Amino acid sequence: MRSLLNCLKITTDMRHILIIGAGKSTGVLVDYLLKKSEEENLKLLIADKNIDQAKLLSQNHKNADAVELDIFNEDQRRAYVQKASIVISMLPARFHIEVARDCITYGKSMVTASYVSPEMQALDEDAIKKNLIFMNEIGVDPGIDHMSAMQVLDRIRAKGGKILLFESFTGGLVAPENDDNLWNYKFTWNPRNVVTAGQGGAAKFIQEGQYKYIPYHKLFRRTEFLDVDGYGRFEAYANRNSLKYRSVYGLDDILTLYRGTMRRVGFSKAWNMFVQLGMTDDTYVIEDSENMSYRDFVNSFLPYSPTDSAELKMRHILKIDQDDIMWDKLVELDLFNATKKVELKEATPAKILQKILEDSWTLQSGEKDMIVMYHKFGYELDGHKKQIDSTMVCLGDGEMQTAMAKTVGLPVAIAALKILNGEINTPGVQIPITAPIYEPILKELEDYGIRFRESEMEYLGYNPLSL
């Protein structure tokens, strides 16, 4: 590892950006800043526990250095933070707080793409006192969803309109040209988040003034359908708490507020089979999981029978026939393979299911992903009810320039540079929901193909028959 002193050499005219975490979305972030590094006098220090990954992202560029960093090594971490002009944390969300406390200590502004945790929010007063900007939730979801929604909401309100409905959906999916399995899905981000999605409490939202709740075991059978021009029909299941941003968005009196996750039609019904069987459970460990075959794993959730096969028992439990597309989807995953081993010690059902799915759903070299976002706004203005649909589709450009990496990394990078240049200057722990923040960032994102298309029509209200 390069010595600490060598990496902390600075020149007075360079502005130093410390980037902690060299994960999937950091490459796009680094690319953006390196292209700006000459005109903006930027020097990047990419720090990660995997020095090889950090070096790869640095591209041997004269304005980028890579270092190995153990985030739990306080002396090392603080030394890097102390010398930075601004800090970007691309770490898993649970580790941001240690970096944030260092930033308070040494007077550094900070940017993350993660949700604001209670611990992060508790630093708001200290950040304001020190005139520091702690920008969070500036990836894609959360991030671009906030900015694009607030842009339309503020525009409607500026005209005197009253917001009646707001629905927002985002999905990380496989690009159409690589959509080649029966599930119409491949992992484009953290597989664990997909397997455990919806757990931890009932989904909560408002429809036509009524609070609605969907428990986990019903979540994937209560879906909304939506169409995106040029990309066909999608479905969406409810996020856990659609009401989290009601006050933040200024929607306390809204009649319908619903946020969800997008998939291709048919995914949720098929995924519900795993939920009903218990395969997505992450609360207990399967005995002797290391030596189980995939077939053993499936059989462990089925009743004992001295005569019936696992396949027959599965179809009976799920009430599906052999010629049902749901059955074909299960068979496609090679779930009943008696020779493939789980090879995971003390694994939960969710972890085992994740491994099985990764065999089939991992993006291969050359395959591309896609981010789809859909907002629906219902409002009343001058006695007329209208609706705006706003959609965004971003396609990946390969393994290092995935759609997910672009839509996470670019807004983080743009925000960091604007903070560094004083264009974003309101201190405190915050998210990008004010016009001085979202307007210039959304405008610049259009240069990278991340743009929203709007259509306006008469608003007919939410269908009361579905309540």
Predicted features along the sequence, with ranges:
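Conserved Rossmann-fold cofactor-binding substructure of NAD(P)-dependent oxidoreductases
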Residues: 71-83
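Hydrophobic/small residue at the entry helix of a nucleotide-binding pocket
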Residues: 25-29
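Rossmann-fold NAD(P)-binding glycine/threonine-rich loop
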Residues: 114-136
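Conserved N-terminal Rossmann-fold NAD(P)-binding element of oxidoreductases
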Residues: 17-24
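ADP-ribose/adenylate-binding Rossmann-like module
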Residues: 102-120
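Rossmann-fold cofactor-recognition segment
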Residues: 60-73
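Helix N-cap at the beta1-alpha1 junction of Rossmann-like dinucleotide-binding domains, i.e.
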Residues: 49-52, 117
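C-terminal catalytic/substrate-binding lobe primarily of soluble NAD(P)-dependent oxidoreductases
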Residues: 158-467
